[in-house]
Amino acid sequence: SNRGARGLMQLRPATAIALASETHLKWRGNRTLFDPEKNIALGAYYLNKMVSRFGNLTLALEAYNHGPSRLSKYLRQGYQPKRYSKKVLKNYIKIRFQPI
């Protein structure tokens, strides 16, 4: 990404380092983000944290995209972004119900 996010779950290194510490995942530098198993584990953990913090999947997805601090600021200002979460959920439904 143009923001430096890496791997399947598009995690930024600073966020991933903090998540790795919380989950006791061995951090081996930024190359850790290119290990699909570790990247997905960290991304899933982070999304779960955002669901716990914001209370629903739509806000959690927006927090995952914008960052939790920025989303909180938006919400305090009365603005609730929805574009990213709509896009993710639309693609999830499309993929989820597609025959194999």
Show the residue positions of the predicted features:
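Catalytic glycan-binding domains that act on GlcNAc-containing polysaccharides
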Residues: 1-100
